[in-house]
Regions:
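As written
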Residues: 90-98
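Hydrophobic/aromatic residues positioned on beta-strands within the core alpha/beta folds
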Residues: 77-79
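Two-component/phosphorelay signaling modules centered on CheY-like receiver
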Residues: 11-29
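Acidic, metal-coordinating helix/loop segments flanking the phosphotransfer/catalytic sites
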Residues: 5, 27-44, 48, 52
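His-Asp phosphorelay/catalytic-motif detector in bacterial-type signaling
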Residues: 69-75
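Acidic di-acidic motifs
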Residues: 8-9, 100
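C-terminal output helix
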Residues: 102-113
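Conserved phosphotransfer microenvironments
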Residues: 47-67
């Protein structure tokens, strides 16, 4: 079973992703703060740009670098309301950027596509 880590500080969004991904057959772990992020092995990470209140490329890149250091080689899908993140997707190292608000069917489809590579 594909293990997915969801990182989002908004309880509604985190719970929605937990339910949608769980219903799609994924093993889902949710972290709402950086302290909550477990050290176990995952196949994919779906993350909000948690530490980025006002978007800057540098802050977004710092967040994704921290995830890459903690989970080397694990693909990251960014789910964010920051339109600039889509423009910077390749430079940020995100496998995909999904804009909030999103169609709930996009999340499991993106995880399937990302983990199939």
């Amino acid at each position: 079973m594909t293990r997915v880590l969801v990182i989002d500080d908004d309880i509604g969004t985190a719970e929605l992703m937990r339910v949608v991904l769980g219903d799609a057959g994924f093993d889902v772990t949710v972290a709402m703060t950086t302290r909550d992020i477990p050290t176990q092995k995952f196949d994919c990470i779906v993350s909000d740009l948690m530490s980025v209140q006002v978007y800057t490329y540098e802050d977004a890149r710092d967040w994704l670098l921290r995830l890459a250091d903690r989970f080397p080689g694990i693909p990251v899908i960014v789910v964010t309301a920051h339109l600039e993140a889509r423009r910077d997707q390749a430079a940020l190292g995100a496998r995909r950027v999904i804009m909030k608000p999103f169609d709930v069917d996009l999340i499991p489809a993106a995880v399937r596509e990302t983990t199939a590579r």
